[in-house]
A protein has these predicted regions:
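Conserved core beta-strand positions within WD40 beta-propeller blades
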Residues: 7, 47, 95-97, 136, ...
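Short loop/turn segments that connect beta-strands within beta-propeller blades
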Residues: 21-25, 61-65, 109-113, 151-155, ...
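Blade-level signature of beta-propeller repeat domains, shared across WD40, Kelch, NHL, RCC1
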Residues: 242-271
């Protein structure tokens, strides 16, 4: 959800994008997509940008809801039945950046809807939303657990960090030369953007209690953690996954403190 231009804008499981009057809550307009809308909209220059599970990314006039353009993404190259956009967009210098379940990360011209460039991610979805700062775009992947830094203008890869297949749903936050992002491992990672490495990590209480979830080299022990339980009891499997203390929400940095929530039920404030 985003508030801008006197309106409140959000997507819904009924496939609509809604615009409400911020003062009264009355409906200004709604726009029907072809599937559910999980992503939060971004607004720039009076245009609303948001993706849908119908595999299209939309640009709408924020005042009227009129479609300005739509951009068609693809399908997962491995599973082939996975499409759609969960990543919220970032807009900078006339370009819209977003990830997709077709395993690509896209840069699209904000005015025309034409692709500027795309970056493939080896069969891994990009659910995490990007951050853009000082000519660079930052995002992370799900299945492969990679954190990428690309040149925002050209899409040229600058460097990547490998988090050993621990998925990222959390989106990055940048403050004071440090980027903060959480993973399914239950760790908040502080990445020094100048040194291009992890400066420190914080482990949630749930993560500390679930040593069997990791192998000796730090990669996920899926068999011990999830698969046996999922096959026998879906409810127990989900509970086990949540108990790992994964960080699915995005951190917020304010002053000298970073705030983040976890599936272990805690909200943490770190200094």
């Amino acid at each position: 959800m985003v508030r801008n231009l006197g309106g409140v804008y959000f997507g819904s499981g009924d496939s609509n994008i809604y615009a409400l009057d911020a003062a009264s809550g009355s409906l200004k307009w709604k726009f029907k997509t072809g599937d559910v809308v999980h992503a939060s909209p971004a607004i720039s220059g009076g245009i609303l940008f948001v993706g849908s599970w119908d595999s299209y990314f939309y640009a709408l006039d924020a005042g009227s809801g009129r479609e300005v353009w739509r951009f068609k993404t693809g399908e997962d190259p491995v599973i082939h039945n996975q499409v759609g956009i969960q990543s919220s967009a970032a807009v900078a210098d006339g370009v819209v950046y977003f990830g997709c379940r077709d395993s690509k990360f896209y840069a699209v011209d904000a005015a025309t809807g034409k692709e500027r460039w795309s970056y493939p991610n080896k069969g891994s979805w990009v659910i995490s939303s990007p951050a853009v700062s000082e000519g660079k775009v930052y995002f992370a992947t799900s299945d492969s657990g990679l954190f990428h830094v690309l040149d925002a203008k050209s899409g040229t890869p600058l460097y990547s960090l490998d988090f050993k297949h621990w998925a990222f749903f959390s989106s990055p936050a940048i403050a004071g030369g440090t980027l903060y992002i959480g993973s399914h491992q239950g760790r908040l990672n502080a990445i020094d953007l100048e040194e291009q490495k992890v400066a420190w990590t914080f482990e949630t209480d749930g993560s500390k209690k679930n040593g069997p979830a990791y192998t000796k080299d730090g990669t996920p022990n899926y068999e011990a953690s999830f698969f046996d339980l999922f096959y026998d009891d879906m409810v127990s499997g989900v509970q086990k996954m949540l108990s790992v203390g994964a960080i699915l929400s995005s951190p917020v940095a304010a002053g000298n403190t970073v705030y983040v929530g976890s599936t272990d039920g805690n909200v943490y404030a770190l200094m």
